[in-house]
UniProtKB/Swiss-Prot annotation:
Segments passing through the bilayer: none
Taxonomic lineage from the root: Bacteria, Pseudomonadati, Pseudomonadota, Alphaproteobacteria, Rickettsiales
PROSITE patterns in the record: CLPX_ZB
Summary of subunit composition and partner proteins: Component of the ClpX-ClpP complex. Forms a hexameric ring that, in the presence of ATP, binds to fourteen ClpP subunits assembled into a disk-like structure with a central cavity, resembling the structure of eukaryotic proteasomes.
Keywords, alphabetical: ATP-binding, Chaperone, Metal-binding, Nucleotide-binding, Zinc
GO annotation terms (biological process): cell division; proteolysis involved in protein catabolic process
Location of the ClpX-type ZB domain: 1-53
Protein task: ATP-dependent specificity component of the Clp protease. It directs the protease to specific substrates. Can perform chaperone functions in the absence of ClpP.
Protein species of origin: Rickettsia rickettsii (strain Sheila Smith)
Binding, ATP: P117, T118, G119, S120, G121, K122, T123, V124
Official protein name in the record: ATP-dependent Clp protease ATP-binding subunit ClpX
Length: 425
C-alpha cells in the first residue's frame, strides 16, 4: 500500500528518508520501505547470485576430468559416465552463459533420466557428481510423493530438502542437483490417460512438470501441511539440474515386442531373442517405449537426456568390493581397524559373495547386506577382544564354518624364557 497522508511524518525504516524525498513509500506491519531501498536490495541479491554462480562455474572440471573422478568411485558404466559428464558440464556452462548476459541464443536445460537395474550405480553416480561440483544435493524417493491435497509428500518438499542441504542459501540452492529415485514407480497404471484420479502415478508426474522445467516455486520452510500459516520461500528452479533414476522392470519386454518383427498379436512371445541380455535390449530404448511403460509425454519431454546402465557381472561386483576409493571391503576393514582388529577376506570368499549378489539380483546394493550379515558376530566380539584378525573364507560365506578369529598379539610374548643353569666354576 502506498501511503499518501502525512508525508512529513512518514520515513523509510531502512534509510530514514522522508516520504516526500522518495518516489514511493511502501507500508508494512509497523515498518516502511522506499523504492530506493527496494532497488538496493534487488541489486544485492543479484550480486549474491553472481558470486554463488561464479564459485561453481569457475571450478567446474572438463567432461574428461569429471569422468576420471567418477572412475574412482563407480565401476564400469563407461557410456553412462561419459553422457553424464558432458551433460553436467554443459548444464553449468549454460548457467555461466546466462549470467554473462549474452543471451543471443537461448540454451535450454537438459535434465537426465538414468535407466538401469537395481544396484547398477544410478544413485552413486548422482551423489559423486554433486561431490565433484561441490553443489547442494538432495535425494527424493518418487514412491513417497503424491499430488497436492492427498496423503503423502508434496513435490515442494523435495525443494525444501535442497534448501536444507544448502543451509537455506537460496542462491546456492538454485544451482543445486536433485536426484529423484524410483521414478518408474510413478508410471500411470495404463497406457491410456486415466479417467479417475491417479494421485501417486500420473498425478505426481503432472506435479513434477513445472519444477523440472523451471518455475518460481513457493517452498514451505517448515514443511507444507503441519504449518499452513508460515511464510513461503520463493525458489527459482530454472537452473536446478534434475536427475531421475529407475529400474523400469518390464520395459525390456516392451522394447523386445517393438523390435521383434516376427512377433504376431498381443499374445505373442516377446522373449524369442534369448541370447540378448537386458543391458543389450535397453540400448534399443526409444521414447515410445517409455510412453508405453506409463510415463506421460510431457514428463519425458522434461528429461531430454536418457542413458541406460549395464547389469553388473561377477567380475564387476568383485571389483566394486575391493577397488574403488569407497570400496565396501575397505570400509569394513577401516571399521575393524578402529577396534584394533584386522579383517581379511580371501579371493574365493569375494567370488562367492559376488555370486550370491548375482543370484539375488540386487547388484552392488546387495553386496553390503551380504557382508553385514557375515561380519555381524565378528564385529560384536572384536570390540571386546581387541587385537584380533578375522578371516573370511569361501566356507564362511557359504555358512559351513564361523569366521576365523586369531590373535594379533606377537607370539614372542607367549614364548617361555630359557632357563639358564648355574655352571660351577
Amino acid at each position: 500500500m502506498v501511503v499518501e497522508a502525512d508525508k512529513k511524518a512518514l520515513i523509510c525504516s531502512f534509510c530514514s528518508k522522508k516520504q516526500h524525498e522518495v518516489k514511493k513509500l511502501i507500508a508494512g506491519p509497523a515498518v516502511f520501505i522506499c523504492d530506493e531501498c527496494i532497488d538496493l536490495c534487488t541489486d544485492i541479491m543479484k550480486e549474491e547470485n553472481k558470486v554463488a554462480l561464479k564459485q561453481i562455474t569457475s571450478s567446474i572440471p572438463t567432461p574428461q576430468k569429471i569422468c576420471g573422478i567418477l572412475n574412482d568411485y563407480v565401476v564400469g558404466q563407461d557410456q553412462a559416465k561419459k553422457i553424464l559428464a558432458v551433460a553436467v558440464y554443459n548444464h553449468y556452462k549454460r548457467l555461466e552463459y546466462i549470467q554473462s548476459g549474452n543471451n543471443d541464443v537461448e540454451l535450454n536445460k537438459s535434465n537426465i533420466l538414468l535407466i538401469g537395474p537395481t544396484g547398477s550405480g544410478k544413485t552413486v553416480l548422482a551423489q559423486t557428481l554433486a561431490k565433484i561440483l561441490d553443489v547442494p544435493f538432495t535425494m527424493a524417493d518418487a514412491t513417497s510423493l503424491t499430488e497436492a491435497g492427498y496423503v503423502g509428500e508434496d513435490v515442494e518438499n523435495i525443494l525444501l530438502r535442497l534448501l536444507i542441504a544448502s543451509e537455506f542459501n537460496i542462491a546456492k540452492a538454485q544451482k543445486g542437483i536433485i536426484y529423484i529415485d524410483e521414478v518408474d514407480k510413478i508410471a500411470r497404471k495404463s497406457e491410456n490417460p486415466s479417467i479417475t484420479r491417479d494421485v501417486s502415478g500420473e498425478g505426481v508426474q503432472q506435479a513434477l512438470l513445472k519444477i523440472m522445467e523451471g518455475t518460481v516455486a513457493s517452498v514451505p520452510p517448515q514443511g507444507g501441511r503441519k504449518h499452513p500459516q508460515q511464510d513461503f520461500v520463493q525458489l527459482d528452479t530454472s537452473n536446478i539440474l534434475f536427475i531421475c533414476g529407475g529400474a523400469f522392470m518390464g520395459i525390456d519386454s516392451i522394447i523386445t515386442s517393438r523390435t521383434n518383427h516376427s512377433s504376431i498379436g498381443f499374445a505373442a512371445n516377446v522373449n524369442i531373442d534369448k541370447e540378448k541380455n537386458n543391458s543389450e535390449i535397453l540400448k534399443s530404448l526409444e521414447i515410445e517405449d517409455l510412453t508405453k511403460f506409463g510415463l506421460i509425454p510431457e514428463f519425458i519431454g522434461r528429461l531430454p537426456i536418457v542413458t541406460t546402465l549395464d547389469e553388473l557381472d561377477k567380475e564387476a561386483l568383485i571389483t566394486i568390493l575391493t577397488k574403488p576409493k569407497n570400496a565396501i571391503v575397505k570400509q569394513y576393514q577401516k571399521q575393524f581397524e578402529l577396534d584394533d582388529a584386522e579383517l581379511v577376506i580371501d579371493d574365493s570368499a569375494l567370488e562367492t559373495i559376488a555370486e550370491k549378489a548375482l543370484a539375488k539380483k540386487t547388484g552392488a546394493r546387495g553386496l553390503r547386506s551380504i557382508l553385514e550379515h557375515l561380519l555381524l558376530d565378528s564385529m560384536y566380539k572384536v570390540a571386546e577382544l581387541k587385537k584380533q584378525r578375522v578371516t573370511i573364507t569361501k566356507e564362511v560365506v557359504n555358512g559351513l564354518v564361523e569366521p576365523i578369529m586369531t590373535s594379533l598379539i606377537s607370539t614372542k610374548s607367549n614364548k617361555k624364557q630359557p632357563i639358564i643353569a648355574d655352571i660351577p666354576a
